[in-house]
Amino acid sequence: MSPNVSRLCRWQIILVLVSMLTSTIAGGSPSSRFFLQPHDRVVFYGDSITEQRLYTNDVATFVHTRFPKLPVTFINSGVGGDKVGGGWAGPLNVRLARDVFPFRPTVVVVMLGMNDVLRGHPLSAYEQGYQLLVAKLKKHLPHVRLVLIGPSPFGDSATPNKINDRLIVMSRFVQRLAKQNGGLFVDFNAPLVSAMARIGQTSPKLASKLIPGKIHPGASGQLLMATALLKAWHAPSTVTAVQIQARPLATIRSDHTTISLLSRHAGRLTWTQQDTALPFPIMNLHAHCPQFPPISRTWTINSLVIELPYSGPPQLAAFTNPLAQQVLRITHFYRTLDAQTLMVNGLNAGNYTLRINNSIVGTFTQGQLAAGINLAKYNTPMLQQAYRTLRQVWRISSMRYFAWRQLELTLYASTANQTQTYVASPWVHVKPGRIDNTSAAQRAVKQILAGYSKLVHLQQLRLFHMMPALPTHYELSPAAGPNAHSGGK
């Protein structure tokens, strides 16, 4: 063998090994391109737009379903009314010391600016306050990775307005600040304005619902925000990608899944998949999602009122949210962030019914299956498991919100005369009022807070135990009826 051929063979072997390694990394664990890594602790810091817990829970749900084995925790520390210098929940020093630093975050995501604009603060004050915020984060958390977000827009249409013009100027400053401090900048303003313009061309009324009330984006608007953040984090587009050849019977492709028991009998194909990821459960596609989600839901049993943590809006099979549909369309969401493709080649002409775990997913033509279908659009067992994950993410955020806002803040928000103001709680019936720092009531609240902190931790462990994706059994058989249907979301 000549030296040139020998070198060529060595390079071919190296390329094959690199390809195998890349494929292994991509399945079920983040690649080096994805922003989050094992054991990251992510704190979302901001105002009421963050406090809504919509885009933050979308992001958390995406990460937990796309990377089921990735140990990452998410904490929402958004407070309504906050500015770069703080707000009613305390000045900046208090906010950071109580609501950020104790979690030892490796990633801090910041979005602030709306209240600074609405209260008429000059741009210079915003810039100085933001610089101080970043400096304190870097001093206390030397290795923190900063994600600075250009604030979401003001207004319920794409028509320019003075308030949003100021937000855009602030966003440009945030972009420069992120670059100066080695952080990542993500723009939330432009995607929402662009979406309002595109949807408004055919349905202005529908477009106005992206930001009801002009300040707080609804669930569809915040899905756009989550999409922008996930793309900036290099989130992978693929859930799974499967290609099966019917004749001769073979597995051609099995990205992010393991295929076993592939067989063909009397025109019927069957196989089993063990996926390493789940499709993304879109919270408001088949649900009426409140703009400001509650922290709990009430159940009445034999006149006994029980409060349980809010686990997201109920999914309604007969309802499809037209605004969510438009957002998915203009962002090409299923192609760019939620591709769960199944391709079957070599079938005879005709229609075929796909069943997963004995449940009918849909009936498809031979041509549709050869081109590939995106299972993320269908009500599959995998999507149902993903919705269970979504509900658990909401339970955790609701319990954390309750423990923090209705217990912890009563212990820390001291007034000038060293007393505490207690807020009425829907879970713990503490009488509202002012009590001193040494009272039995405050000690009781501390005990309850400690108990809820443990409960939140247990719920986080339960979330990880819900993973990974469960094995699924596929059956593709000739359809009895003459017509195919696409079904799906």
Regions found by a protein language model. Give the residues of each.
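Substrate-gating cap/lid alpha-helix
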Residues: 156-188, 330-344
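Extracellular serine-dependent O-acyl
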Residues: 145-151, 168-207, 223-240, 245, ...
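Bacterial N-terminal signal peptides
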Residues: 12-23
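Oxyanion-hole/transition-state-stabilizing segment in secreted/luminal serine hydrolases
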Residues: 35, 57, 79, 87-127, ...
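Serine-esterase "nucleophile elbow" of acetyl-processing enzymes
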Residues: 15, 26-80, 95-104, 225, ...
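Active-site segments of SGNH/GDSL-like serine hydrolases
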Residues: 114-115, 134-169
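Conserved catalytic region of serine esterases and O-acyltransferases that act on ester linkages
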Residues: 37, 208-214, 219-489
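Bacterial N-terminal signal peptides that target proteins for export
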Residues: 1-14
